[in-house]
Regions:
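Residue-level detector of functional hotspots within protein domains
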Residues: 2, 46-48, 61, 95-98
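Short, surface-exposed linear patches
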Residues: 3-5, 38-41, 59, 84-86, ...
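Structured loops at beta-to-helix junctions and adjacent beta-edge loops in soluble globular domains
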Residues: 19-21, 65, 115
């Protein structure tokens, strides 16, 4: 990325974090319109890396929306997949309720577990 961005656009930097485009919302709709959704998903699934599972953000962080609703991750938030069966506000949460709670997953989760993994801090392994 650093080489291409410098060559094409003259952009120079010390650090670059890249995250996988999740096949949800606008990007998912774009892929579907172009007939590329299944190919993209197959690529993510075929590159699943079990070593990424301990480092995915949903294992240690939650996402809170502007109304105080709790989600396992930013992507679940965009899909309105609440952490609990019923929406819960952060001010109603007893923190211990999160310990051992199941993480809601979907096909989009392969985006964080493909290859070297993906998170806001960069690759996972």
């Amino acid at each position: 990325y650093k080489r291409e961005l410098k060559a094409r656009f003259g952009i120079v930097f010390n650090s670059l974090y890249t995250i996988t485009n999740m096949p949800i919302k606008r990007f998912g709709a774009f892929l579907k319109r172009r007939g590329l959704y299944q190919h993209y998903m197959n690529t993510l699934v075929q590159n699943f890396n079990v070593q990424t599972l301990n480092g995915v953000m949903c294992r240690s962080l939650v996402s809170i929306d502007w109304e105080g609703n709790i989600y396992d991750c930013d992507f679940n938030q965009m899909l309105e997949m609440h952490t609990f069966d019923q929406p819960m506000k952060v001010w109603d949460l007893i923190p211990e309720e999160l310990i051992g709670d199941k993480i809601r997953v979907g096909n989009h989760c392969f985006g964080c577990t493909a290859g070297a993994g993906s998170s806001c801090g960069g690759e996972l392994v």
